[in-house]
Amino acid sequence: MRKLTLATIAAAFSAVTIVVFGLPGSPATGAFDPDRPNGVEDPCRNVQTAKKLLCPDLRIARPSEMYLDRKVVPGRVVLRATNDIRSRGQGPMEIRGHRDHTFSMNVTQAIQRRAGGYALYPTQARLRFFTVGYRWGGSYWKVRDPLHFELWRIDEKRRRTKLVRTGPKQFYCFRDLERTNPSPRSPAAAVYPACNQNPKVRHVTLGTSIGWSDIYPSTYHLQWIDVTGLRGCFAYVLHLDPGNVLFELDKENNVSQRIVRLPWRGYRHRGC
């Protein structure tokens, strides 16, 4: 192991800017305003601050690969969907967890600086050591509530009017699963691996690089909304960062939807 010198330590600190501010209550008690993630000014949308940063921008693709599942919950009918969280900003979405409880971590967002290194911003996001079951690999350090599955009633103009159901899934990884938008700024190989599975680790880093996606297939654990007994036209919505605890360039691309007719009989039988 390389011996740390005072010069090495000083160099490490010079590569990082730490931004500290007070934060209000957890998003569990109510989402923050999109214009003020975590209840503070967004450095990625402050003109002066953003000039010095390579800010991330996550986007959510429309729900896809949808199908009915009558087996996962006895006596119920659920509509499954694939989600694709796309990283399309100036820099990667990177978050760093630091253990503060037995099975959870607080989260700091690391945003690349144009001059090199990172600026670190505390957030109200949380990581948890979460079990998805043996079939899906056991337990992982995952992000809480980065994406919600929502089902909305719509009017005759397809505008969402009332939230009627939500999906059960709460925990996701941020990782480089598939390079979906290659570009000169997009790394050719994955930088951020699958989520850490060590329950004893004190620190973890999760992220998604520019041009890469974190995709969960419709067959995966809890990728569904219960649609039992519902009839008519609805918007099947994927809502990215619903608590507004991540800093990014644009919050307007954090919602996608697909109009569906229930009972579900496939994409060609909507009539909405």
Each language-model region and where it sits:
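N-terminal export and membrane-targeting signals
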Residues: 1-12
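C-terminal region of N-terminal signal peptides and the immediate post-cleavage residues
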Residues: 18-34
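Boundary/junction segments of secreted and surface-exposed precursor proteins
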Residues: 31-85, 90-94, 269-272
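Beta-sandwich strand segments
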Residues: 33-42, 46, 52, 90-96, ...
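Short amphipathic, basic-aromatic surface patches that mediate peripheral association
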Residues: 64-67, 77-140, 150-158
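Short beta-strand elements
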Residues: 112, 117, 248-272
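Exoplasmic/lumenal beta-rich domain surfaces
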Residues: 146-147, 155-230, 241, 269-271
